[in-house]
Structure formats: structure tokens, C-alpha cells
Amino acid sequence: MTQMEMARKGVVSDEMKKVAEYEGVDVEIVRQKLAEGRAVLPKNKLHRIERPMIVGEGFSVKVNANIGTSQGFSSLEEEKEKARVAIEYGADSLMVLSTWGDLREIRRAIVEMSPVPVGSVPIYDSAVRSYQMKKNVVDFSEKDFFDMVIAHAEDGIDFMTIHVGVTRRVLDRIKSSRRVLKIVSRGGAIIAGWMIKNNKENPFYEHFDELLDIAKDYDITLSLGDGMRPGAVVDASDAQQFEELFVMGELVERAREKGVQVMLEGPGHVPLNEVEMNVRLMKKIGKGAPIFLLGPLPTDRAMGYDHIACAIGGALAGYYGADFLCYVTPSEHISLPDVEDVREGVIASKIAAIVADVARGNKKAWELEKKMALARKNFDWETMFSLSLGKDVAKKKYEERPYPDKGCSMCGPFCAIKIAEEFS
């Protein structure tokens, strides 16, 4: 049985117990949300996960970190180090999005070492294999769509991005649209190119039941990818984006009927004033399914600092109901991220998630804020460092300019906390 099917039958799995303990909630709440499809617990039957996560309504906002190779940069050891650093700094899941080297070796290695759920985009493999065989990136068969999904499932992948909403109708609309950037989703572009070349419907959409059968066999959580997401704030919230969303909303019900866990992916470039509308619409059309957002970025002019823009958009999106934030690194739109980029990206998105949790009244988040306040009151630096996301940076800065008494070198003898303590 899938986690959803177990939940519907009143069965509480070990993973449900673990996430309930982590969230600080009764396991019955976990079971109920999973049964309703308002939360997902990504866990392939073949993958042993030490730190499972629950994503959805009523739970803490989660953060995903993308890693993976690219042409000219295909070191397995570097990707393993990226994974290690991402997890160390608080990533709740990883996605392996490699497009060069031995993709299966890399994927299996990350799944084997990862204590958290691992996701992927299977269609990349089809395109990469075609390119490496000196063919066009869309020169693969309809059968390849599903063969790659099975291969990823057999390798222990817990959740998969499937761009099922890129239909012929949606594609026709995008061709005549006034968008500046027509398609910016790599998976969406590959599928769109295949559809145009072969003059066929998207196999993932046309044969969605076959996809559901595979997902159910392995208990793969389907992340319905938004292949028509806007790639710039000037293109945000247009007809193409929402038409695809309506397709995805219809498929949520079909997945639930089959007992397959499902979530919706959302736009990555959204002006701040449209974030609330986008999140609420996704929740409504998706019948309360969890929402997985890339960012979102509320400006396109932050190159080199896109992780900061991402944190701003992500915090607001999380407050309005987004459940899962995909990080963005300082290298976004520029180059393949290195290990340091991964660290910076995870910290920025974790800040956004924490800000959202506090604003939403998450009990655990507020308890940690109280601990930090008390540590500051008591000048308990070690506790402050331990509660901080960037504890190594915080400690380094403190030690670089030390102060011999209570407080720090910012205020010295004029520390407000110390003065108030002395004269109160």
C-alpha cells in the first residue's frame, strides 16, 4: 500500500510516526492529512529514509535543494559534497537534476547516501541520452517517457517532477502568446519539443493512468511540474500559466482516486503583489494539494543575489500557504552552482521557511524563537550559535572581533541589554 492508502485504512506507518514527532503533532493529524491528500510523505518503498518529511497543510514549510551535473562539470564527488552540505544546513529533501556523466550512477549514489527524500525529473534522462548519441535532444520514443520513470523508481527516487500539464491545447496557446520568454522549464521545453516534432499529445497526459500505475507500485509522490511557468515577472500570472494549472488540478483528483500521492509545482517568477493570489489559486484549483514553489523570485534583477530575492518571495508565499520551497542559489541564471552556492541557497530558503512558520503561528517555530530570545538575554553565545542557521559564520564573526565582557563588540560597555539588567 502507498502512504495515502495506509492512511485511508487507518494504518499508521513508521514514517508517519517519525514526521509526527518531528512536527510536534499527534500522529492522527498526520494520518488524516495524508488520507485527504492535503499532505504528502514522499517515500519510495525501495528507499530507506532516516529523516522522512511531511509536506502540506498544517505542517512546517519544507526546503528542497537541487543538485546535479552539467556538461563540463560532472564530478560525482562534488555532487555528493553538495548533497552533504545541503543536508547539513537544513535541506529537507534533495533533487538530483544531472544532465551529464553517468546519470544513473550519480542518482543511485545520492539516493544511497541521502537520509532525506530524493526527487528527480526523469525526462532529462531521455534528452541526455539522445544528445550523447549525437541526436536531437527530443529524438526519443514515447516508450522512453515511461521507461525512464520506471528506472528512476527502481533507483529509489521518492518524488518525481512530471510535466503532465503541457498539453497540445496549452502549447498552441503559448505559441501565440505575448510572453517575452515562452518556455523556461527545461522539462517542459523538452516535452514541448517532442510534441511538436512528433505532432502528438504529451504521453504523460495521454497515458496518465499508466504513470499512476508506476507511481502506485513504488509509492512515488508525483510532483506535477509547471512546464508553462513564467520565466520573468513581466510574464507572471498569464493565461498560459493558469490554463496549465487547470489541467493539473483535474489530474490531482485522478491521482487521489488511485491512492497516489500528488503535489503541484508553482511559478518561479512572481511580483510580490501577486504572490498571495497565485498561492491561493493553486490551493483552490489543486483541491488543497501541497504546493511546491521555485522561489518565487519577485524581481529578475538580482543576478548573483537571486537567493536573497528567493527568500523574500518564499517567505511571503509560505505565509500564504505554500508548503514546499525549492531553493535558489547565487548562481541561478548564471552558472552551475558549486558547494558554497548550495550552502548559501539552503540557508536563504531556510530563513524564508522559518519566517513563514513564525508568521503562521507554528508552535515549534515559536518555541525556538523564545529560546533564542532567552539566550540573548543571558548572553548565552553557544546556545545562540546552535539555534542559528549560519552558526559557523556567526561564531567566526564573533571571534574575529571579541569583547572581553558580556555583550559583543558592536556596543561594548553601552550594551542595551546589560544596562537594562544592571539598573532594572
Swiss-Prot record:
Its cofactor is [4Fe-4S] cluster. Binds 1 [4Fe-4S] cluster per subunit. The cluster is coordinated with 3 cysteines and an exchangeable S-adenosyl-L-methionine. [4Fe-4S] cluster binds at C408, C411, C415. Its EC number is 4.1.99.17. It catalyses: 5-amino-1-(5-phospho-beta-D-ribosyl)imidazole + S-adenosyl-L-methionine = 4-amino-2-methyl-5-(phosphooxymethyl)pyrimidine + CO + 5'-deoxyadenosine + formate + L-methionine + 3 H(+). Keywords: 4Fe-4S, Iron, Iron-sulfur, Lyase, Metal-binding, S-adenosyl-L-methionine, Thiamine biosynthesis, Zinc. Catalyzes the synthesis of the hydroxymethylpyrimidine phosphate (HMP-P) moiety of thiamine from aminoimidazole ribotide (AIR) in a radical S-adenosyl-L-methionine (SAM)-dependent reaction. Belongs to the ThiC family. This is Phosphomethylpyrimidine synthase. It comes from Thermotoga maritima (strain ATCC 43589 / DSM 3109 / JCM 10099 / NBRC 100826 / MSB8).
